[in-house]
Amino acid sequence: MNYCYDSPLIWPQIDIPKEEIFVSESKSSVKPEEIGSLTPANTGSYHLYRFVHAFEGAECSSVVFLHTIPGYQSPIKERMLYSSCKGNLIDSLTRHYGIEIQRKLEIEDFKELTSVFLIDTLHPKEVETPLSFSRPKGPAGRGPRRLIR
């Protein structure tokens, strides 16, 4: 079963006493700006979000893994569990469920999570690097450099 394509937002959580990951909620139609209002501000969490958007005239669907870090508002054990389980969760989502995750983001404040932010993150603008100064060649006929001791 592929959860991510049935609903755009999946909310896996860790049961701290049992140290197990389970899917606590899923939502059907959620905009990126609304995810913060669904999440408690004082606990860490994971979100698997399918972001459907238009880019350069084409319809795109990208899966984004969000790891919420509430700062120092949550207990240390909870922060450590969420940080240490992230890699295994992503690996199992990829291997067992076949979910291809385009971006993995760590977010401390949901105010920065907007559609524009996700589009810029998923489709970064290519920056042209200016040509750097190329050093001119030395005079011809001087021979190879010698090491003087």
Per-region residue spans from a language model:
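Long, low-complexity regulatory segments enriched in Ser/Thr/Pro/Gly and acidic residues
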Residues: 1-63, 67-149
